[in-house]
Every structure is written in structure tokens, then in C-alpha cells.
Amino acid sequence: MLLNAKPYVEAKMKELKERLSELDVTPKLAIIQVEGNQASDKYVGNKKKKCAELGIPVELYYFSKDVDSHTIEEKIAELNSNDEVTGILIQLPLPKHLDEQFLINQICPYKDVDGLTWYNIGRLSQGIYAIPPCTPKGVIELMDFYDISLEGKDVLIINDSNLVGKPLA
């Protein structure tokens, strides 16, 4: 079965625009990216484009591929304490010399837009409200959009990443 996500995306964007217009604050996204991955460049470009369509300002912090962990930790601490920044994400993957999970865990859980801090993952795994990883949430919402129930069905997920496979399972 192949699902067309375009109608869902259009409906979701409309819903988000309405919800954003009701807020007293303007959300602001900070993206931390380390050079060296062309796919990441494309993903970040798409995120910036969608945020622009929604009127959400984005700040991109782009680091050289040989950046040290301490430099990124300092930037995350700065963004955590900045009240204007409401969401932070680290564009994955990072170069091998950087510990992805350690750096992700430096993000305040309530600013963790990818839902990848141990705090959010732990709450989610216990059935307690948490910020969910966005791709699995989008998959579930897409299934709901088309009234497709997975209850009682066998589903094969070919992915074991913390961002997609594990939360989706």
C-alpha cells in the first residue's frame, strides 16, 4: 500500500498555522548542524522552508566537521538559557568523534523538538506524555488521516534508530 502524504501535509500545515496564530509567543527553532553530510544539508533546508511557511524563525548554527564536543555543549547551554528559543534540534548524524546521545541530552527536555533526550524517550516508553520523535508521530498521524488501524496487525519495521525505528515500534 502506498500512501500519498501531500493531502495530510497540507491539512497539517493549515492546522499548525491556526494553532500558531493562537499563541502568545512566537516559537523559534535553533538548529545545530555539523558539516560533512549532504543529506543533512537537504533536511535542514526542508526544515527551514517549512518553518518559514509557518512564520517560525530559525537560527542555524553550522559548525566545521572538526568541531569539538565542548563547543557544541556551550552553544546548547546558551540556547537552553535563551527564552526566545523555544526549540532546539541537533541535525543527525554527527561525525564519529562526537557523542550524539551525550550532546542531545544537553538539550532541555522541553526544548527537545526531536524527542531524543533520555528524559523524553524514558517518559514515552512508560506511556507518560513526552515530546515524541517527529517522524514516528508523522507516520502514526498519516495512518490516522487515512483511517488505517494497525491494532491487531503484524507490522515489520526495518529500522532500529532512536529517531525512527525504536519509537515507531
Show the residue positions of the predicted features.
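Short beta-strand elements in bilobed, periplasmic/extracellular small-molecule ligand-binding domains
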Residues: 51-66
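Positively charged, low-complexity intrinsically disordered leader regions
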Residues: 1-25
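Non-catalytic terminal and connector segments of soluble metabolic enzymes
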Residues: 53, 78-80, 107-110
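Anion-binding alpha/beta catalytic cores of soluble intermediary-metabolism enzymes, centered on
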Residues: 90-155
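Helix-enriched interaction subdomains in cytosolic or periplasmic regions
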Residues: 1-7, 82, 98-105
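Short, well-structured alpha-helical segments in soluble
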Residues: 71-82
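Glycine-rich phosphate/diphosphate-binding loop of Rossmann-like nucleotide-binding domains
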Residues: 34-48, 133-169
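Short beta-strand segments enriched in small/hydrophobic residues
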Residues: 26-36
